[in-house]
Structures are given as structure tokens and as C-alpha cells.
């Protein structure tokens, strides 16, 4: 494929690269938490049940806050949504490292804060930002690039995380994660919204409740949502 024909403009290219880096950081870190379990068990007294519960809560808040960050994206911009998401993500990593991080607070840090962060930084919001920069005949490929970046994050992050854990321990590894998320905060500033899309947002008078009613009146949307509890939730827990 001719790259010049695929990329509409410089802004689209920058946004595509930024979105890809965002999901590499976000999904990559998320995929490594299972490697920390034995350290959490020894140093924090975390049981398998507590760890599994925290990860389940993380998935729940990931899904619960997705529509809210979608609303923020429509109302303000995807850049704002992802930036806020990385702040929650960073807070979760910070408290997981420095405390409070035992008992309820373990679930709060790993489950709630990081779950909220994932709702904005994982795959949905970055894909929606990128798709607005590309015409329909090229949009699928652009989305595929971002999705592939997320898969790359899944693949490579357990490798370097295992190395860091063996060489430095879990606390320094979480510090490295914090530095990566700080980089993600900077990268999120390069997620641009097309001017035409901004004008359409300003002209859109649909309220959040109207959008929710419209979504739940669509059978396909309801089936897709129910399907998550069969596939997405279980697969994510198994992968962890």
C-alpha cells in the first residue's frame, strides 16, 4: 500500500502513532499484573481470592466507565479523556506501590483506580479518535494498526516485566510502569480531533440520556453487551 495515499495528512499520522503508543502502554501494563501475584502474596499478604476479586473489579470498572469517557470524548476531546484516564492509571500504580495497598485498598488501587484508567486508555477511545481521521475505505486498516499495537503490547510487556521483576523486584518495576504512564500522559497530548469533527460535536444536541436510550433500544447492542460476559470477562481473567 502507498503510505502517502493511506495517510490523509500529517495530523492523522501523528494521531495514529500516538494512539498506538497509548494502547501499547495501557494494555501492555495491564497484561502483566498476574506476574506480580507471588510478590503481592508474600509482601502484602494478598490471597488468590483477593487478587482475583481485584482483577474482576478492575474489569467491571473498565466497562462501567467506558461510556463516561466516551461522553467526555464527545463533549471535549479524546485527548482529554485519555489524559484523565492515565491520571487514574498512575494513581493506581502509585498507591499500589507506596500504599495504602492492603485489604480493601488493594482492591481500590488495582481494581477501581486502574480499572477506571483502562476505560479511557485501553482500546475503545484511542480507536474512536483514530477512526475520525480516516475515510471509510481506509478506516478499517487504521483501526487494525491500533489493534495490532495493543497486541504487540500484550506480547512484549510480560517479557520485559519478568526481567524487571527478577532483576529489581516488584516495587522498582511499578516505578518503571509509573514512568511509562507519565510518558503516556505526554503522548496523549498528540491525540488530535479533526476540525470537521469538532464542528459536528458543537452542532450535536443529543443528551447523554438520549444516547443511552438509543443504544439500549438496539438489539444488536444489547446482544453485544451480553456477549462480553461470555467472552471478554472470562478471557481477560484467564489471561491474567
Label every PLM stretch briefly.
Residues 56-71:
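Central cavity-lining transmembrane alpha-helices of secondary-active solute carriers
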Residues 103-121, 229:
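Hydrophobic core of transmembrane alpha-helices in multi-pass small-molecule transporters
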Residues 146-196:
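Helix-loop-helix hairpin linking two adjacent transmembrane segments in secondary transporters
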Residues 14-48, 66-69, 238-240:
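Extracytoplasmic
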